[in-house]
């Protein structure tokens, strides 16, 4: 019996040329990703702050299921093919095809490579390749787009176009990629010891609360439909309220603990100078 070749590891790299007014952060591993994050506030020459995310072949990175309360978000596909889950609906967008494709035939279903995500809409996106891999056992025949194996490049931006998105990505990645903690107070060292492996997730929750990124911890829409067999109206009337309540309670608890211990969502050591100066002057 022939052996299946192991899947090569995804290799992230910075885009060449770099998107204007950005610097890259690379994260390796199975969820390899390259973030190109704005380093300065908006200006007449750069009115919309765009974070460009590149996902190499075989990356299993996902944005995670989440929502925003203060912003409308836009996802613009530049290259490759992505799966977008938006308020219970699954979409595959292909840059080479020019828009959303039919999941069964692969034909163009709707032109356009920009996905609008309204405030409070639950959404998640990833490489289409990763989504198809998870659907193999379902049995439904699906036609994949030609560019499913290409590197994925997506621009994220918001309306209003303020500092929150770049501050979020700089501080999120600053926490995740830090090789060691910055200078900690005695209280922070005690909390870090007590939390153990939850120290980093706790800091991320503080960032989520402050910078308008609300994770959905339990996908009750899927649980109610697939495992409990409940009708869709149950989620429409009750499920989403439970999801939002759980998210609020968890993040609020983290915010209170962060306030008590002095753990902040935005810190100077994780933030480029021009963004930090704008944040100190005007807030988010």
Language-model segments: residues:
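Jelly-roll (double-stranded beta-helix
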Residues: 2-72, 76-78, 83-284
């Amino acid at each position: 019996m022939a052996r299946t070749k192991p899947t090569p590891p995804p290799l992230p790299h910075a885009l060449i040329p770099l998107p204007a007014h950005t610097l890259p952060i690379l994260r390796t591993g199975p969820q390899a990703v390259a973030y190109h994050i704005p380093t300065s506030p908006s200006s007449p020459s750069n009115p919309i702050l765009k974070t460009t995310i590149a996902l190499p072949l075989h990356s299993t990175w996902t944005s995670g299921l989440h929502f925003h309360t203060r912003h409308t978000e836009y996802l613009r596909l530049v290259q490759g093919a992505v799966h977008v889950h938006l308020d219970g609906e699954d979409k595959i967008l292909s840059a080479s095809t020019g828009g959303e494709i039919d999941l069964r035939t692969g034909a163009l279903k709707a032109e356009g490579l920009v996905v609008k995500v309204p405030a409070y809409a639950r959404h998640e996106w990833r490489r289409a390749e990763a989504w198809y891999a998870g659907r193999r056992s379902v049995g439904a025949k699906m036609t994949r787009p030609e560019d499913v194996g290409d590197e994925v490049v997506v621009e994220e931006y918001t309306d209003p176009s303020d500092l929150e998105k770049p501050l979020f990505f700089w501080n999120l990645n600053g926490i995740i990629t830090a090789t060691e903690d910055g200078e900690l107070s005695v209280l922070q060292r005690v909390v870090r010891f007590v939390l153990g492996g939850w120290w980093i997730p706790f800091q991320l929750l503080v960032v989520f609360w402050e910078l308008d990124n609300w994770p959905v911890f339990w996908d009750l829409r899927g649980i109610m439909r697939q495992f409990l067999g409940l009708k869709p109206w149950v989620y429409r009337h009750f499920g989403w309220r439970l999801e939002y309540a759980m998210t609020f309670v968890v993040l609020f608890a983290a915010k209170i603990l962060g306030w008590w211990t002095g753990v902040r969502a935005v810190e100077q050591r994780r933030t480029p100078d021009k963004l930090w100066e704008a944040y100190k002057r005007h807030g988010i």
